[in-house]
Amino acid sequence: MKQKIVMSLLLLGFAIGGAAQNALPDTLLFVFKLHGQTRKYEMTFTPKNDALVLNWRILRNLKWQKGSYALTPQAVEKGTVLSFLMPEDGRHITLPEHETAYVLSQQAYRSLKARQRFDYNHTEYILLDSDERVADFALLHVRDTLEGGEMWILDNPALPLVWSMQNNPLEINWRVEINK
């Protein structure tokens, strides 16, 4: 009987350990490349009553600057525009109902999964591959059909995070890193 209990505890420990590897950490590091400069923002995404709150912070001149973006329930469900609003210290901004920040809306994510394409910012994106993985999630690699901008989107229906943006015509590129 003792042997069965010990074996059960070991198996439970392995299962919990494996599940922990699949989870994203609470805080993600966004590394932005903008006009030759690099900026690193720590960001957390917190669901709140069908909405989503993104808290950000950055260490500048030995002082933490911070703020937030709130995505309305309508934006989380049906947003069609990715906001590129620059963070400003102390500002807590609720984005318009058609805008999201660093995530796709549920409608766009469902379209990407079902049709291998979606529209955002009045631009069509098509799925190229899903070869890369992070935290045991696939990254859905898409490219816009007009100017060649690319995104890698976390294949996670709970948080379809834009993990990386490259070749952005606005020259606002980023990649998420997981702090170890």
Predicted regions and their residues:
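Acidic, serine/threonine-rich low-complexity disordered tracts
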Residues: 21-86, 92-180
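Bacterial N-terminal signal peptides that target proteins for export
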Residues: 1-7
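Hydrophobic h-region of N-terminal signal peptides that target proteins for export
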Residues: 11-19
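Functionally constrained cores in energy, signaling, and assembly domains
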Residues: 4, 18, 164
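Acidic/proline-rich low-complexity IDRs
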Residues: 8-11, 94
